[in-house]
Amino acid sequence: MQNTEDGSQALKHLQHPRFARAYARAVGRMNRRGATEHRRRALAGLHGKVIEIGAGDGSAFVLYPLTVTHVLALEPDDYLRSLAVKRAATAAVPVTVRAAAAERIPADDGSADAVVASLVLCSVADQAAVLAEIRRVLRPGGILAYYEHVRSERPVLGAVEDLLTPAWQRLAGGCHPNRDTLGAITDAGFTIQDNQRFGFAVQSLTPSVAHILGHAIR
């Protein structure tokens, strides 16, 4: 497996050391509660060259099907990327880890068969810009595989998420709990192939939060 850590001064504003360490500790619990199977469903059927944005600690690397020939995994946070590099070494498919943000994907136009966004579109500063960049690197007919938490359709819970968002994004690495990510994907020109909406509690004592999982075609 090829791994690179070419850090950049341009990524300094995307460093969240405390949140990154807290997130890395929480991922194991999330995975045991069902996040692993959610990611597995999102990755099923992918093939060829794949770009994963916001790869985090690399938990998804072992889940890629063998039909994938290469994964370019992008993670701007130094700490999470260091964990991803270690996981890339034991992945079932070739994985290259790069220091890069989703706003500027280091890939040519139309070079990817699929792009994976897993619990990352909640935290990017500009969803529309990131989705436009994803469209740029996808070939015509390429797939965006997504697994994201989104704003609740329940009026009271949705209002609470709206209220919490300004403080939460400062504490949680830019995360917005109130985004309409499915709407943003369709507004960006993608065609939804399949979509599942479900509640998922990341820990036993936390409330169930709305999630979406599916695939969209460029």
Which ranges hold each PLM region?
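Core SAM-dependent methyltransferase catalytic element
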Residues: Q196-R218
